[in-house]
Amino acid sequence: MFELPSGAEIQSIIATLKASVGFFIPEIYLSLLFMILIVVDLVVKGRKSTLLSVFSLVGLAGSLYFIYQQHAMQAGEFFFGMYVLDGFAIFFKYFFVLSGMLAVVITMADEQFEREISSMGEYYALVVAMVVGMMMMASSSDLLMIFLSMELVSFTAFILAGYFKSNMRSSEAALKYLIYGAVSSGLMIYGFSLIYGVTAQTNLIAISRELALHGADSFVMLFAALLVLAGFGYKIGAVPFHFWAPDVYEGSPTPVTAYLSVASKAAGFALLMRFVYVALPHTNNVQAATLGIDWFTLLVILAVASMIYGNVVALWQKNVKRLLAYSSIAHAGYALLGVIVMDKLGTQATLFYLLSYLLMNFGAFFVVVLIANRTGSESLDDYRGLGKSMPLAGAALTVFLISLVGLPPTIGFIGKLMVFSALIAKGSIFMWLALIGILTSVISLYYYMLIPLNMYLREPVQHASSNTGTQPRLVAQLFMGALMLLTIYFGLFFAPLSDFARYSASIFGLQLQ
């Protein structure tokens, strides 16, 4: 029979909530920013795109201060074990705020937004809301909180993908994203319900403890694992849960494509790593089956399939955004290699790889936006001759693409080197995974270099308008140059980022060896 809580119990709940609020300050701050942006958009009259853009940038930058303050806080659970604060969560909070800021900058540079959208307040508010949701994903330590935070991110992503309402491609992208997202969410929540049915727990640490003590039916756990993996696989865009990615990335506004391909993917990895490392009873032998489930083999299949499929299919793409979409599938596979290692070195490698991907992928999409402003096209053929007419954009895009391949002296080389080193350090079958990663990187060299080949070695076609447009604004060129220099700088002096990734590799509830 249901009974109302006593006065003492209510007082205890209130005290717990008060004690937990201090750990939630960045999310509260950004939620206020979300509401302020909507109010400013409603109150201020006339053209206010620049005001809203700058306000969003400054507001997002302000959240970095509150995140920095969390370094001094004790790692642990709060909000009744539904939320956790640790170095791992703080890393991703920084990551998501920087992603949001870069998305705002790319939006400011995209002239299509000026033509399609008269008021930008709702758009920037949605970008901020998505940052809040992804922060919650990184800190979620409970099945219910995982699902709620994922849905917050998904709903905002659906709207952003279809933000150009008059554009048929954008509307189609949003619809496909919604359908695939609904199916994957349904599968994942069913998997969560099976786990709850077996353990009677929703907290990840409690689930691990319950499974270690009492075990579970291997068939039920295998079925639940596949369903949960489908949800996480959809979020990171890994094969065979990738079907939404090419069409959604191609049809969405380019700043949204960049945002989804980096930030949303990283949020999926944050959840996947916390779930696999914390909710599952951890053993030193990563190849050993846990509760009758060969997690190692499942993740290996996802990683290898993503690397091979993403790189091979990208060979035939003629649309640059679609090409980068397939390459993002391959990069999900490379990042999964670090997860498979299941030790602190592998976690550090994955975090560093995501940092490198943040820089080089946002940089590549920023140049794609500037070129689209001039040519009105995303076709690979219309990139012909742009190396001469847009020399800085050509040089910057070449550097970003070299980094995406994983060649020195760029940050992408260090990212892949760390992932492959973590695999080789494990020996055995892990060395074969490293070899597959290297070979698929060689494949990616071909399609990535098609873009500089068109820009520098082929004459522009007659119908292209690439020689008649204006040069990018000075601020955009300076920002593009800064991203290019940072891509090279951190390829040479990577120690600060590597140390930060190592510091962030400690996950509450599990001490990786």
Curated annotation (Swiss-Prot):
<dbReference type="GO" id="GO:0005886">
    <property type="term" value="C:plasma membrane"/>
</dbReference>
<feature type="transmembrane region" description="Helical">
    <location>
        <begin position="260"/>
        <end position="280"/>
    </location>
</feature>
<feature type="transmembrane region" description="Helical">
    <location>
        <begin position="394"/>
        <end position="414"/>
    </location>
</feature>
<dbReference type="Pfam" id="PF00361">
    <property type="entry name" value="Proton_antipo_M"/>
</dbReference>
<feature type="transmembrane region" description="Helical">
    <location>
        <begin position="49"/>
        <end position="69"/>
    </location>
</feature>
<keyword id="KW-1133">Transmembrane helix</keyword>
<comment type="subunit">
    <text>NDH-1 is composed of 14 different subunits. Subunits NuoA, H, J, K, L, M, N constitute the membrane sector of the complex.</text>
</comment>
<feature type="transmembrane region" description="Helical">
    <location>
        <begin position="88"/>
        <end position="108"/>
    </location>
</feature>
<feature type="transmembrane region" description="Helical">
    <location>
        <begin position="474"/>
        <end position="494"/>
    </location>
</feature>
<feature type="transmembrane region" description="Helical">
    <location>
        <begin position="178"/>
        <end position="198"/>
    </location>
</feature>
<dbReference type="InterPro" id="IPR010096">
    <property type="entry name" value="NADH-Q_OxRdtase_suN/2"/>
</dbReference>
<dbReference type="GO" id="GO:0042773">
    <property type="term" value="P:ATP synthesis coupled electron transport"/>
</dbReference>
<keyword id="KW-0997">Cell inner membrane</keyword>
<dbReference type="GO" id="GO:0008137">
    <property type="term" value="F:NADH dehydrogenase (ubiquinone) activity"/>
</dbReference>
<keyword id="KW-0813">Transport</keyword>
<comment type="function">
    <text>NDH-1 shuttles electrons from NADH, via FMN and iron-sulfur (Fe-S) centers, to quinones in the respiratory chain. The immediate electron acceptor for the enzyme in this species is believed to be a menaquinone. Couples the redox reaction to proton translocation (for every two electrons transferred, four hydrogen ions are translocated across the cytoplasmic membrane), and thus conserves the redox energy in a proton gradient.</text>
</comment>
<protein>
    <recommendedName>
        <fullName>NADH-quinone oxidoreductase subunit N</fullName>
        <ecNumber>7.1.1.-</ecNumber>
    </recommendedName>
</protein>
<comment type="similarity">
    <text>Belongs to the complex I subunit 2 family.</text>
</comment>
<dbReference type="InterPro" id="IPR001750">
    <property type="entry name" value="ND/Mrp_TM"/>
</dbReference>
<feature type="transmembrane region" description="Helical">
    <location>
        <begin position="323"/>
        <end position="343"/>
    </location>
</feature>
<keyword id="KW-0874">Quinone</keyword>
<dbReference type="GO" id="GO:0050136">
    <property type="term" value="F:NADH:ubiquinone reductase (non-electrogenic) activity"/>
</dbReference>
<keyword id="KW-1278">Translocase</keyword>
<keyword id="KW-1003">Cell membrane</keyword>
<feature type="transmembrane region" description="Helical">
    <location>
        <begin position="429"/>
        <end position="451"/>
    </location>
</feature>
<feature type="transmembrane region" description="Helical">
    <location>
        <begin position="117"/>
        <end position="137"/>
    </location>
</feature>
<feature type="transmembrane region" description="Helical">
    <location>
        <begin position="144"/>
        <end position="164"/>
    </location>
</feature>
<feature type="transmembrane region" description="Helical">
    <location>
        <begin position="219"/>
        <end position="239"/>
    </location>
</feature>
<feature type="transmembrane region" description="Helical">
    <location>
        <begin position="295"/>
        <end position="315"/>
    </location>
</feature>
<keyword id="KW-0472">Membrane</keyword>
<feature type="transmembrane region" description="Helical">
    <location>
        <begin position="20"/>
        <end position="40"/>
    </location>
</feature>
<keyword id="KW-0812">Transmembrane</keyword>
<feature type="transmembrane region" description="Helical">
    <location>
        <begin position="351"/>
        <end position="371"/>
    </location>
</feature>
<keyword id="KW-0520">NAD</keyword>
<dbReference type="GO" id="GO:0048038">
    <property type="term" value="F:quinone binding"/>
</dbReference>
